[in-house]
């Protein structure tokens, strides 16, 4: 694994329950742009459409060196999962309050992979408690 992009906001906004690895279908200009850097997870989420899983809202900047055949920066991108994994995700999403959030984008061999997580949104008091626990742990390490 070489270049890794993480969704740091997902760890703050959500309680991550279960993780899945999925391939992602990218065009040539998207691959070059990801290698150049600048991926943004800010509004990214995954949705199950029939037998497919789509990643929406992931921002991959336009590749500067590409010609007229460049990609749309926030287009839907298809995720590649086994049928059993899709059914497991579908059963998980049927539970109230769960959503599918991308947590990492990385290169594994020649291919780019996305790590998805079934997640439950945190309330404000949960975020504050997590911040307080991190602060206490940091102070204990410093002693």
UniProtKB/Swiss-Prot annotation:
The main location class comes to: cytoplasm
**Superkingdom assignment:** Bacteria
GO BP of this protein? trans-translation
**InterPro entries the record matches:** SmpB, SsrA-bd_prot, SsrA-bd_prot_CS
Per UniProt, which keywords does this protein have?
Cytoplasm, RNA-binding
Write down the Gene3D superfamilies for this protein, in alphabetical order.
2.40.280.10
Subcellular location(s) of the protein: Cytoplasm
**Does the entry feature the keyword Membrane, yes or no?**
no
General function of this protein: Required for rescue of stalled ribosomes mediated by trans-translation. Binds to transfer-messenger RNA (tmRNA), required for stable association of tmRNA with ribosomes. tmRNA and SmpB together mimic tRNA shape, replacing the anticodon stem-loop with SmpB. tmRNA is encoded by the ssrA gene; the 2 termini fold to resemble tRNA(Ala) and it encodes a 'tag peptide', a short internal open reading frame. During trans-translation Ala-aminoacylated tmRNA acts like a tRNA, entering the A-site of stalled ribosomes, displacing the stalled mRNA.
**Entry's family note:** Belongs to the SmpB family.
- Which NCBIfam families does its entry note? PRK05422.1 (NF003843), smpB (TIGR00086)
Which PANTHER family does this UniProt record tie to the protein?
Answer: SSRA-BINDING PROTEIN, TMRNA-BINDING COMPONENT OF TRANS-TRANSLATION TAGGING COMPLEX
State the protein's name: SsrA-binding protein
